[in-house]
């Protein structure tokens, strides 16, 4: 794991009307680090993840990915940067029901015009590593909850991003499948070198993460 920060944020403030959700957040996240973000509901965890993912902007503060100041990017540049560098996983798998799991995984690469001749070989390896190769031709309704979420993770990885941001990814899974999904994050990190930032209420995942950030009332604490 490199000590050089992949993500560096300083003084992040986010307001919604008169409500201050983030209050001067400073953080750095290293390459290949798995970071858990924990805290009570309403603490600002999802808002922080949205800002780190560049889908929302802070009212104050700065955000750098290595040497790139993402706050200075125009809308088109920012969209391109996000497609290439950031993957997202949510509590709901958000797989489109009319497409097969394989087609769902490919969508971000197709939309971002990032599909190459190596994509199929990469997916074959990825599906094999995740234990879902035999299920890739099925539609989401034919899959178990654990399988659906694994394909959602594969979709987040399709463009080989530097970082994967996950918001309660195991929140809808039973204990067994939640543990399988958490184990998968570490396997993928070790194989492909991604950084994972995971909002979670799961104490096992928080304890196993390389580092845990505690967010309360919009502030990071010990």
List each model region and its residues.
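Short, Lys/Arg-enriched, disordered terminal segments
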Residues: 1-3
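Basic, Gly/Ser/Thr-rich N-terminal segments that form RNA-phosphate-binding interfaces in CRISPR RAMP
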Residues: 222
């Amino acid at each position: 794991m490199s000590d050089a920060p992949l993500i560096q944020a300083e003084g992040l403030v986010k307001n919604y009307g008169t409500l201050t959700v983030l209050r001067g957040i400073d953080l750095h996240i290293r390459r290949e680090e798995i970071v858990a973000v924990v805290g009570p509901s309403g603490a600002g965890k999802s808002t922080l993840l949205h800002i780190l993912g560049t889908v929302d902007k802070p009212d104050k503060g700065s955000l750098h990915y290595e040497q790139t100041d993402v706050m200075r990017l125009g809308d088109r540049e920012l969209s391109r940067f996000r497609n290439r560098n950031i993957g997202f996983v949510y509590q709901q798998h958000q797989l489109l029901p009319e497409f097969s799991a394989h087609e769902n995984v490919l969508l971000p690469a197709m939309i971002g015009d990032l599909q190459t001749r190596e994509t199929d070989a990469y997916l074959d390896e990825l599906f094999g590593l995740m234990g879902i190769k035999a299920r890739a031709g099925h539609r989401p309704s034919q899959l178990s909850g654990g399988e659906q979420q694994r394909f959602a993770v594969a979709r987040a990885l399709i463009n080989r991003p530097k970082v994967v941001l996950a918001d309660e990814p195991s929140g809808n899974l039973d204990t067994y499948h939640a543990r399988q999904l958490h184990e998968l994050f570490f396997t993928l990190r070790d194989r492909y070198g991604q950084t994972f930032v995971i909002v979670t209420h799961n104490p096992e995942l928080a304890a196993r993460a390389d580092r845990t950030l505690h967010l309360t009332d919009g502030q990071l604490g010990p």
